[in-house]
């Protein structure tokens, strides 16, 4: 997903008052679907736009995002899928590394910052 697509989704959800979570990959080890800096948005209804894995982590991230929104507190998650015996995460689809993801709430009470300002600057940088 491109940055512009992510921003369009953000603007759409924000205009409808949807609380959301910005999930950012901040570290990886080994083979992972995405690398540091990759982001997805997760809505309060567990809808998400983008992927940080080949589909093996997004469901869990959506559940964690719900807790992040309830507490209005960020959360750092580590998913270690390097153990071949761990079929829960790896699923044999290229998710056999370690990935660390930072989840931060984007809510109306703080004007969806810091992503609101980032989106504004990116959309006007042409």
Predicted regions and their residues:
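Segments forming oxygen-rich coordination pockets for charged ligands
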Residues: 1-126
């Amino acid at each position: 997903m491109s940055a512009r697509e992510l921003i369009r989704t953000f603007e759409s959800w924000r205009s409808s008052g949807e609380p959301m979570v910005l999930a950012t990959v901040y570290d990886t080890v080994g083979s992972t679907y995405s690398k540091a800096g990759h982001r997805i948005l997760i809505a309060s209804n567990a809808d998400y736009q983008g992927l940080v894995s080949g589909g093996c982590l997004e469901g869990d991230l959506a559940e964690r995002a719900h807790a992040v929104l309830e507490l209005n507190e960020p959360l750092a998650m580590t998913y270690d899928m390097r153990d071949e015996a761990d079929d829960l995460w790896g699923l044999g689809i290229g998710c056999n590394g370690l990935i660390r993801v930072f989840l931060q709430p984007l809510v109306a009470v703080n004007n969806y910052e810091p992503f609101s300002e980032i989106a504004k600057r990116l959309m006007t940088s042409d």
